[in-house]
Amino acid sequence: MASTMALLVALVAMAGVLVSMPACAMVRHDYAAALSKSLLYFEAQRSGRLPPTQRVHWRGNSALNDGADHGVDLTGGYYDAGDNVKFGFPMAYTVTMLSWGVVEHGARMAAAGELRHALEAVRWGADYLVKAHAAAETLYVQVGDGNSDHMCWERPEDMDTPRNAYMVDASHPGSDVAAETAAALAAAAVMFSARAPGGDRQYALRLLTHAKQLFEFAKNHRGLYQNSVPSAGNFYHSSSDEDELLWAAVWLYIATGDEEYKAYIAGAGNLGGSGQPLGWDNKHVGAQALVAKARYIINH
């Protein structure tokens, strides 16, 4: 899935060796090539109208009417692995992890000649998540139907399966996916706020506005999203919203320094988490790592 590939991008960058190892090494690992191919994957997963910079030339425009059933523009974003469905929950986690990778290791990505591609990958996902946040308390979390999609293997350019859009709102909450989307946009805002090549402070402020609204939406209307969108739960069943709310608060604090997010983190009753590894359904380890790097959040 795309979220797994995002984690791979971060891990490759964290390896810290983006050029060939010395000749005396017994094993040679070309991390630059691994990073390049990992990022190229996201271009192959693009939905919507493709840009002139598209490097995967065997892909074409697809799903150009997404959102039409609700009168909104939901074109763009990423397909999920081999599916033609756009699942908002793992897509948001993917954007968060890609952004984190750039925030921590953008210099190494630049040295490998891949920073621009990483920035483009984040922006492609973030642009879609902004579209999906159609109103302060409305978030579209899925386009397409997983069951019918899995029964019909076809190129996205040719697909004829249903493209229904599904949303969460105040009456049909999804605090887990709303908080994860808040985390994604806040993390992307941190990335684009950087005074570095590819920085875009105006864009970062726009992302941050959506992130703040989504966090408030998630806090004020608690409920797991599969109860509102059962078809999503058949494929990405959420176990809790506590980790996403904490994860979002940490990223929003990093992005803004606002005391309200610090207070939320300090008051979180489950900072320790469940001991599960970091993944699209469990963010406790990621939140712990970020808080540990900035432990004054809790102590001051």
Task: Give short role names for the model-derived ranges.
Residues 1-13, 22:
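Classical eukaryotic N-terminal signal peptides for Sec-dependent ER targeting/secretion
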Residues 26-300:
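Glycan-recognition and catalytic cores of secretory/periplasmic carbohydrate-active enzymes
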Residues 14-29:
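N-terminal signal peptide
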